[in-house]
């Protein structure tokens, strides 16, 4: 059974400004494992990576129904890629999480569908 759906879209230039302007932006948004991946990226690819993770985490928090805040933080959510490159969202819940991330020249977008573990 579907428990929630969340979507988020973010402008790449907004994320780029936050990366360049706020010293701890990446540390507040990305887990240590995600930061290790980000450290290998530069320029537009880094911005796309951070924006995609930001949008995915926002979409997850919307699907849960809480938003980012007291109950769910950016660092409670980790996104890794499987062997085929598909993004997979990890968190400390029992939900089955379906995630899709996409980019264009100007935007990153992510959608999350939460499913109950006993379907």
From Swiss-Prot:
It holds the Pfam family ACPS. Its cofactor is Mg(2+). It catalyses: apo-[ACP] + CoA = holo-[ACP] + adenosine 3',5'-bisphosphate + H(+). Transmembrane segments: none annotated. Keywords: Cytoplasm, Fatty acid biosynthesis, Fatty acid metabolism, Lipid biosynthesis, Lipid metabolism, Magnesium, Metal-binding, Transferase. It is an enzyme of class 2 (transferase). It is found in: Cytoplasm. This is Holo-[acyl-carrier-protein] synthase. Its EC number is 2.7.8.7.
């Amino acid at each position: 059974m579907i428990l929630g759906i969340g979507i988020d879209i973010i402008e790449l230039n907004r994320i780029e400004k936050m990366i360049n302007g706020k010293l701890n932006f990446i540390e507040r948004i990305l887990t240590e494992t995600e930061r290790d991946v980000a450290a290998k990226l530069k320029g537009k690819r880094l911005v796309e990576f951070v924006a995609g993770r930001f949008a995915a985490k926002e979409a997850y928090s919307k699907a849960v129904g809480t938003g980012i805040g007291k109950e769910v933080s950016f660092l409670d959510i980790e996104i890794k890629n499987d062997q085929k490159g598909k993004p997979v969202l990890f968190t400390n819940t029992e939900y089955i999480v379906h995630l899709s991330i996409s980019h264009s020249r100007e935007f990153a977008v992510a959608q999350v569908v939460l499913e109950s573990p006993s379907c």
